[in-house]
Amino acid sequence: MRNWLLPEYIEDVLPRDAYRIEKIRRLVMDKLFVHGYQFVMPPLLEYVESLLAGSGSGMNLRMFKVVDQLSGRMMGLRADMTPQAARIDAHLLNTNGVTRLCYASSVVHTVPDEITRTREPFQVGAELYGHSGIESDLEIQRLLLECLSVSGIQSIHLDLGHIRVFRSLIYGSGIRPEFEMELYAALWAKDTSALRELVYTGLNDLDKTVREALLLLPELYGDETVLLRARKYLPNFPEIREALDQLEHVAKALEPYVDRIIFDLADLRGYHYHTGMVFAAYTQGSPVAIALGGRYDEIGKSFGRARPATGFSLDLKQLSRLTDINDYPRGILAPWKPQDDELAAMIKQLRIAGHIVVTELPGENSKEVARCDRNLVLRNGKWEICPVSG
């Protein structure tokens, strides 16, 4: 067996890529900090029940599990930090007002989300708890766009959806849970033939307006005309009207900051835990979303304290492959002269100023120090910074 081999979709991050990821992380975290989001560091490993709180069966399948040798209970390696942040808000901070939290660390998946992705994403996210109004949805989405912008993502296409449109059709017509899940699966897969068969055979007693609305949902994808069609053809349920109003309000507010906004009223991603508006950000060069988010008001219920919540998360590894940040820094090569106090003082000042200074060790070949494009050279009794000669 070759001991240096890594499992599939697990990789080392080498210096240039690691530098780019770390630079983006600092830029994004600084953006979150100045908006009042407090940094938390949940554990990599905890009991499975906590990690699965408020999530669907998909999270259970994505999670690596081990038996705790101390308690005998099943533990999991986190596949998503959102439930952990919700646990911290609900059970540890336990405040009544608005709480803003952010996080940045690795998560681990049993299988990659996409064929081009890793099983160890570096997840960065922001969560806002304690406010149920559209204003907090707008704050989170604006913050996401600012984070993408400072990361070097220039062209952003935003998809907006709302879970309550589909859910209102289900609950307003009394559809049984087993049919709800079948309808959800058909819509999620965009399987219009299965959807048609369900509403005409399995649900033949369904109200005509609800039946037509369910069949229309996959077609409600596109620009702002989608909302006009939805208002015209969907049932006049109060929750549907409110959902469409929220989508319109957010789209108008965000329009100046994105290249394009698309509405998708059949987007049921995260249906098992999302409760309101959902969104996804895309950019050129990526066939999949670069950031996901939405409202999930019930997630804290599993920890004994349901709170309104909305947030987003993204994978810095994925983002780093799409950004135009490519300023891998060069350094200054200093000779090995431990007795030279003037040289030592100059090196110290350069490092304080943020410059990279590499001290060449005895026997080290300076030509191999490829990261350095300048030398410290003694000229006329003074140390000077000079370009590395050809």
Swiss-Prot record:
What GO molecular function annotations does the UniProt record carry, in alphabetical order? histidine-tRNA ligase activity
Q: In which pathway does it act?
A: Amino-acid biosynthesis; L-histidine biosynthesis; L-histidine from 5-phospho-alpha-D-ribose 1-diphosphate: step 1/9
* UniProt keyword annotation of Amino-acid biosynthesis present: yes
Question: SUPFAM superfamilies, per this entry?
Answer: Class II aaRS and biotin synthetases
Kindly give the Gene3D superfamilies that the UniProt entry links to this protein.
Answer: Bira Bifunctional Protein, Domain 2 (3.30.930.10)
Pfam family membership, one = tRNA-synt_His
Localization, per the record, is: Cytoplasm
Top-level taxon in the UniProt lineage: Bacteria
Q: Which UniProt keywords apply?
A: Amino-acid biosynthesis, Cytoplasm, Histidine biosynthesis
Q: What broad class describes the main subcellular location of this protein?
A: cytoplasm
- HAMAP family with a match to the protein in the record: HisZ
Family, per entry: Belongs to the class-II aminoacyl-tRNA synthetase family. HisZ subfamily.
Q: How does it assemble?
A: Heteromultimer composed of HisG and HisZ subunits.
Described function: Required for the first step of histidine biosynthesis. May allow the feedback regulation of ATP phosphoribosyltransferase activity by histidine.
Under which name does UniProt file this protein? ATP phosphoribosyltransferase regulatory subunit
